[in-house]
Amino acid sequence: MSVDISTVKRVAHLARIAVNDDDAERMTGELNAILGFVEQLNEVNVDGIEPMTSVTPMDMRMRQDKVTDGGIAAAVVANAPVTEDNFFVVPKVVE
């Protein structure tokens, strides 16, 4: 895959980034170098290799899930101007 100036300008337009011609020319070379590196990475055989989430092994501490009401409903709505049965009351905005 190769990136040209028109592609750089189109991507810049979609990202709402102002790019002048000199910068677009420079970015073309940089993006082509990045894409070349990505193509090299795609050539590496990674069959049978587990994905790594951290460079050091870490066991996740697990706990049992418990369904609760949180026990702080009154505190959550304490500063609300209008509440009803521990729910926020807001003006109707859709008919």
From Swiss-Prot:
<dbReference type="InterPro" id="IPR036113">
    <property type="entry name" value="Asp/Glu-ADT_sf_sub_c"/>
</dbReference>
<keyword id="KW-0648">Protein biosynthesis</keyword>
<dbReference type="InterPro" id="IPR003837">
    <property type="entry name" value="GatC"/>
</dbReference>
<keyword id="KW-0067">ATP-binding</keyword>
<dbReference type="GO" id="GO:0006412">
    <property type="term" value="P:translation"/>
</dbReference>
<keyword id="KW-0436">Ligase</keyword>
<dbReference type="Pfam" id="PF02686">
    <property type="entry name" value="GatC"/>
</dbReference>
<dbReference type="GO" id="GO:0050566">
    <property type="term" value="F:asparaginyl-tRNA synthase (glutamine-hydrolyzing) activity"/>
</dbReference>
<comment type="subunit">
    <text>Heterotrimer of A, B and C subunits.</text>
</comment>
<comment type="similarity">
    <text>Belongs to the GatC family.</text>
</comment>
<protein>
    <recommendedName>
        <fullName>Aspartyl/glutamyl-tRNA(Asn/Gln) amidotransferase subunit C</fullName>
        <ecNumber>6.3.5.-</ecNumber>
    </recommendedName>
</protein>
<dbReference type="GO" id="GO:0005524">
    <property type="term" value="F:ATP binding"/>
</dbReference>
<keyword id="KW-0547">Nucleotide-binding</keyword>
<dbReference type="GO" id="GO:0070681">
    <property type="term" value="P:glutaminyl-tRNAGln biosynthesis via transamidation"/>
</dbReference>
<comment type="function">
    <text>Allows the formation of correctly charged Asn-tRNA(Asn) or Gln-tRNA(Gln) through the transamidation of misacylated Asp-tRNA(Asn) or Glu-tRNA(Gln) in organisms which lack either or both of asparaginyl-tRNA or glutaminyl-tRNA synthetases. The reaction takes place in the presence of glutamine and ATP through an activated phospho-Asp-tRNA(Asn) or phospho-Glu-tRNA(Gln).</text>
</comment>
<dbReference type="GO" id="GO:0050567">
    <property type="term" value="F:glutaminyl-tRNA synthase (glutamine-hydrolyzing) activity"/>
</dbReference>
<dbReference type="GO" id="GO:0006450">
    <property type="term" value="P:regulation of translational fidelity"/>
</dbReference>
